[in-house]
Amino acid sequence: MRLAIRALLACAVLGLCLAEQTVRWCTVSNHEVSKCASFRDSMKSIVPAPPLVACVKRTSYLECIKAIADNEADAVTLDAGLVFEAGLSPYNLKPVVAEFYGSKTEPQTHYYAVAVVKKNSNFQLNQLQGKKSCHTGLGRSAGWNIPIGLLYWQLPEPRESLQKAVSNFFAGSCVPCADRTAVPNLCQLCVGKGTDKCACSNHEPYFGYSGAFKCLADGAGDVAFVKHSTVLENLPQEADRDEYQLLCRDNTRKSVDEYKDCYLASIPSHAVVARSVDGKEDLIWGLLNQAQEHFGTEKSKDFHLFSSPHGKDLLFKDSALGFLRIPPAMDTWLYLGYEYVTAIRNLREDIRPEVPKDECKKVKWCAIGHHEKVKCDEWSVNSGGNIECESAQSTEDCIAKIVKGEADAMSLDGGFIYIAGKCGLVPVLAENYETRSGSACVDTPEEGYHAVAVVKSSSDPDLTWNSLKGKKSCHTGVDRTAGWNIPMGLLYSEIKHCEFDKFFREGCAPGYRRNSTLCNLCIGSASGPGRECEPNNHERYYGYTGAFRCLVEKGDVAFVKHQTVEQNTDGRNPDDWAKDLKSENFKLLCPDGTRKSVTEFKSCYLARAPNHAVVSRKEKAACVCQELHNQQASYGKNGSHCPDKFCLFQSATKDLLFRDDTQCLANLQPTTTYKTYLGEKYLTAVANLRQCSTSRLLEACTFHRV
């Protein structure tokens, strides 16, 4: 009896273990069930141990999404539109593995939707009303969903019938698959014969990517909505392509070869989705990675992962070449991209915003942590609601919110401007620290500040830049300019490895791994334990003043800006730890191995650093710029209501929302990118340090790299 019970228990445990090691793949047809069974059996033949495959059948992709959310299945491959659906509540699924196309040496996980026009025409994207349009087909991504979603707020009222609204917007169109009886204007330009006119197939000559481009080339239409490769595929000669241009979202034009800087939206590839919590994403990746190694393109004669005798695009697209794992920090909205999500939201009545996203009524500022949120809320009240506040626990979380449209702007140090730029954000206004007079300050951004290494004058004279190994270090924060990117970039070029926690004996580098020696010196929040080494003001050693305090109380060297010592000594900081400090009690370490007075920073610094700058999404930049100029007129250094009501550039603690020594926010050229703002030298330094990067957001933002 006991043996029987033990056997039953063993079987139960084994069953649970196998269930935990099995990926339940959701299928939507009998043909998919057949391929899934072949997939399951083929995996067993080469990998008898887990991960295993089990097949679950549902009647539609939406039913598969529900099954995964309810833990009745684990995975299914979806197109971008369904990835969007799966990411919504109550499903909350996330993409975990992407199909890639193109080539294995240059894998492509997305394509660009573009608007193509003839070069000799003279209108912009905001002047399409009354023009003639060519579309790949009704409901298709590049040819309909993206352009119509982005143009939605320009469409004439009423918009309840989207097809009728579009037919009233354009003078004439060819939209294959449209109802030519109900909305004849959408089929007016089509050239199919008889019942093939406006057909949802190649029987309509203007159907699909090449068809929509032919509609433009023939002179039937004024604009064609296609994908970025369409012109190249149809016009391989550069001279012929030169007759066409792209319409950009900022109402300019570029050549058809400049599609990466002039597109309507990036449309990501099909992706495997899973639950956001307990979603088996490691197991799913392990399964698919092994599957592509054994059954990928030209790998096996018996089972083919990316084709099937049972039909087309079963389980995966036949055109896929393989899989790439999606970074953990990449949720549905980062995977799909802001432009794509905006377009799809506009087409969905149930989730459409009440006002167009580009309407400049309010700016939503992103605050990091509790102290910044308190200041932001005070700013919001004084602004009369023109400023709203969103908050997150780290700078990277705030950047992600801006990328996804959940916030609009924040001010960043150069290291985070680099990450924000890689995520598609642009610098809008620069903080100025030296220039004090009104218009001269606003119209002239400064060249930057100096990143320095500070030590105590009383420290061993042998403590120099060349003898930092084994010392205790204090940093403003990981990925910040003066406190991390510049000094660690210089160190990396000397030591040729990324193990900074072994180079320094211990330190405080907010944002580093919590169990590392580079978090040993951190002291966390005054309100209680548990916030040590957080990259926000809950960590009292965070930021310039925090890193300097770390030096005063615990460290051997602090990496800060050149103004930090001056701002916290000689009575300028009344806090208990700083009130008795003298500037002459500190020295700078020079890269040549000498030490100098803190006043000699111009001849003893590690590198020039770009000033902090406000960043936003490109389409929101003009609005952010306009509103912040209004705000600093009231609450800036010489604002009409500072200090009696509120001051933008003052903080209860240090450097909240902006640096406290900011004199004004200065205009930048509208064409400024993160690259031009940061400068070539700084970009090179940061790029060299990227192989040491711990930034999960940077990994996510550079996933769609082609």
From Swiss-Prot:
The protein's matches in CDD domains, at most eight in alphabetical order, are given as:
PBP2_transferrin_C, PBP2_transferrin_N
Name the domain of life this protein comes from: Eukaryota
Keyword Secreted listed? The answer is yes
Q: Which InterPro entries match?
A: Serotransferrin_mammal (IPR030685), Transferrin (IPR016357), Transferrin-like_dom (IPR001156), Transferrin_Fe_BS (IPR018195)
Binding residues for Fe(3+) 2, per the UniProt record?
413, 449, 544, 612
Q: Which GO terms describe its molecular function?
A: ferric iron binding
Which residues are modified to Dimethylated arginine?
40
Please give an example of a GO cellular component term from this record.
early endosome
Glycosylated residues, per the record, are 515
All copies of the Transferrin-like domain together span 23-349, 363-691
- Oligomeric form and interacting partners: Monomer. Part of a complex composed of SLC40A1/ferroportin, TF/transferrin and HEPH/hephaestin that transfers iron from cells to transferrin.
Q: Which family does it belong to?
A: Belongs to the transferrin family.
Protein's name in the database: Serotransferrin
Q: Give the organism, scientific name.
A: Equus caballus (Horse)
Q: Upper taxonomic classification of the species?
A: Eukaryota, Metazoa, Chordata, Craniata, Vertebrata
Gene name of the record: TF
